[in-house]
Amino acid sequence: MALAGCPDSFLHHPYYQDKVEQTPRSQQDPAGPGLPAQSDRLANHQEDDVDLEALVNDMNASLESLYSACSMQSDTVPLLQNGQHARSQPRASGPPRSIQPQVSPRQRVQRSQPVHILAVRRLQEEDQQFRTSSLPAIPNPFPELCGPGSPPVLTPGSLPPSQAAAKQDVKVFSEDGTSKVVEILADMTARDLCQLLVYKSHCVDDNSWTLVEHHPHLGLERCLEDHELVVQVESTMASESKFLFRKNYAKYEFFKNPMNFFPEQMVTWCQQSNGSQTQLLQNFLNSSSCPEIQGFLHVKELGKKSWKKLYVCLRRSGLYCSTKGTSKEPRHLQLLADLEDSNIFSLIAGRKQYNAPTDHGLCIKPNKVRNETKELRLLCAEDEQTRTCWMTAFRLLKYGMLLYQNYRIPQQRKALLSPFSTPVRSVSENSLVAMDFSGQTGRVIENPAEAQSAALEEGHAWRKRSTRMNILGSQSPLHPSTLSTVIHRTQHWFHGRISREESHRIIKQQGLVDGLFLLRDSQSNPKAFVLTLCHHQKIKNFQILPCEDDGQTFFSLDDGNTKFSDLIQLVDFYQLNKGVLPCKLKHHCIRVAL
């Protein structure tokens, strides 16, 4: 029977040897292996009358002395992890002895006594120093549970490096030049970062905010896809590059209005000879189909400043140009760029930096390129609609169904949250009714004639109130500072004194969708304003002129036929009514300070 917790070397301790030598042979247990002594005791009946109480007291004293000896030698005697005991003397190799050494009953009792846990742990720590070569090593199947240096509870320091949550600081700029440093995780996507910035900036989350990868030294920029990892994209950017926080209403416009994007002559299918525009979306999202976008583009030669107009074909395998007219035979197609390890960008100032023939340039940039312009594949379209078509086709062919999932995720979240949250009431012509609050309780005016007269009366009352406010707010007759002439400056859609080119640039950056607008000061008339509006991917400007009626200044878009006391009323009206405009005002350009 092995001693649980106490090595056999305790038997060689002087204190223990003294106790063993002082013990008389007549007090040994009859169950011991010493048979001659047992037979002598049975023969002599006089020796059976042993004082039992004295024997028990002697055994208890021996146990107490042995326990103190274990405590004294626990720091020096090793205990192997495999359950075997380290001997003070190495065991001699050879055949096993036929005669086993006699074990006294007192030793058998002492071997069943426990030792302190701390002493055993200290003995285990010194195992490697006292392990002998004659004892075979038994591997421990659970070293992390019983090892002295590995606690059973996982701590952040005990996690492997791959599982540790890495954090990184990312600097994001706004359109007005302000910036914010945000600490993000390594697995944070562009959508997650946009939602975080929306929360920190107290903006309205309408799923149109995007993160823009901006390269000023290359004159390139693009909107990150919602599923892209921000840290991974930043690793491919140069030191001059930066992230911009911007609106983009046209990011998923293709899924809303696919009919308005691709002309019929630009779309072909390899597997079917004819197909309608309604099948366009399914063919782009289906990985087994092979849609193609074809047409003429201006292509800049690598390493040269010259541009050539070539017939270009975009497939899932890459972008090709034809070396012989409009032929698409394999021997006439030359690979221009690969879609797998590249991204498509818009040219910011293509005419000035790359001598582009038009202002509608695009670029296919390999991910490995940082500052060099030699490997950039620069292209140029004839108009903005053609450029949008090529860039949208590139994204669809590269990402496919993943792009559609990015479009559907916000809608699915909105549908799940709608039963638990009160929806914001949309302002439209179908959600407004005429009310009469002249009595003690309000009532709905159902008669159209009565509703029209009530609206006219309310309009006259509003004009009278605004006139009184103008009179009270005027500082001097020469420099009137009325509320109606300055209240619009508090709105996000008013951008102040910017040029026509700047307003067009802002409209293009935030998406050429129908109804996107902004208001600005007129450069030709100091008292007038300009409404810049996008319709059918074209930008138009409408002048807002002031007019006077009964000494009161009004603003009008249609030469005084429809008058408004301030620009806020004008914008509210044309958000509900098209009027003289080609479409209603739907989205306004906004700049947010981070």
Curated annotation (Swiss-Prot):
Domain SH2: 493-574
SUPFAM superfamilies: PH domain-like, SH2 domain, Ubiquitin-like
Taxonomic source organism: Homo sapiens
Effect the entry attributes to changing S134A: No effect on YWHAE-binding
Annotated spans, Disordered: 18-41, 82-113
Effect of K305A: 5-fold loss of inositide-binding
Biased composition (Polar residues): 82-91
Name of the protein described by the UniProt record: Growth factor receptor-bound protein 10
